[in-house]
């Protein structure tokens, strides 16, 4: 199976990752990792995507998770801009539809897994079920789950299901790379304010995003447990500093 490329931002596989110890700013001055560095990596990605398509034995799944305003959309656009669109597909997962709620929590992402020879990108993912839903457990009331819900065990059970599915995919040729774009609370606030102050960014502002800031510590706890439970050599997590967007995009590339 595929094994994780080494990186200073690789979440360890032994469950010792700490959100508090994860940097939101570059570990270097960032200069070597901007501009030319990202463009060179993007060119390499384009070439490698053609090799992937020609081989038709493997697929690549890129998963992006982050707090609001971390830069998921812009990072995906920036990193993948040189890749042949016919070999790449992006799916953004919002609130589940009624059809999706008629299935298990992994169904909607399973249906969108990339075929052999293609790159699939999840902008948010099945991990919402152990992040947003964990912070707001009342959502479980609308998920049509059988029997009584045990909040003491359901999150570990869901993380186990995700972990097992990822191992199954890896054994069958899917290369999985997961990125947590780690933005600080102060930088998130600055970006929210810029969405109000700058007319061309007004459309990005959502009042609910501000409400979610009240649950920041709960989210950090949920992220810490999720990353520790599911970072494995065949499906690694990378905690990428997100306060400096150009650096973040370069590191993802």
Annotate the PLM regions.
Residues 1-253:
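Glycine-rich phosphate-binding loop of ATP-dependent small-molecule kinases
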